[in-house]
């Protein structure tokens, strides 16, 4: 990670090559091949192969969704703890009003800009993307799945 370029709004999205380029690609090929076999050699075995291939693709997609959802839950917990230590007064009492997306986006904000950004997010009902765009001192998340 030392040789990675600094993370910012433009490059913060993570692509997992093993999933996005290998597993997904192989599952798609398996479905196409199974479809070809069903058309060419229709029978119970070919239908079973197609069902297995589709199941493999759905399983891969669900596993990815489960991993990111779990990580979102952990990020929400981390950010609530972080906000408890950074915010004071009325802002601190309004932490529960932040949406899941707002909490997840706030993880990229440096400690110094968090209080103002939280106040703005709550006052303007900022969506996740707008919060990320408003971050000046980007705090990288290099461990995102």
Label every PLM stretch briefly.
Residues 3-69:
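Membrane-targeting alpha-helical segments
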Residues 37, 86, 108-111:
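Charged/polar positions within long, soluble alpha-helices
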Residues 56, 101-104, 116:
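Positions in alpha-helical segments
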Residues 105-108, 113-114, 121:
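Juxtamembrane regulatory segments of integral membrane proteins
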């Amino acid at each position: 990670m030392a040789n990675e370029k600094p993370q910012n709004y433009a490059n913060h999205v993570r692509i997992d090559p093993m999933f996005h380029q290998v597993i997904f690609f192989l599952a798609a090929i398996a479905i196409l091949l199974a479809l070809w076999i069903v058309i060419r050699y229709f029978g119970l075995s070919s239908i079973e192969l197609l069902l297995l291939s589709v199941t493999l693709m759905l399983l891969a997609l669900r596993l990815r969704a489960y991993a990111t959802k779990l990580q979102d839950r952990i990020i929400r917990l981390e950010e609530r703890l972080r906000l408890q230590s950074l915010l004071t007064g009325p802002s601190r009492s309004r932490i529960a009003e932040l949406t899941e997306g707002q909490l997840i986006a706030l993880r990229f904000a440096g400690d110094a800009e968090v209080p103002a950004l939280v106040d703005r997010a709550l006052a303007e009902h900022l969506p996740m993307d707008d919060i990320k765009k408003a971050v000046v001192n980007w705090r990288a998340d290099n461990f995102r799945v």
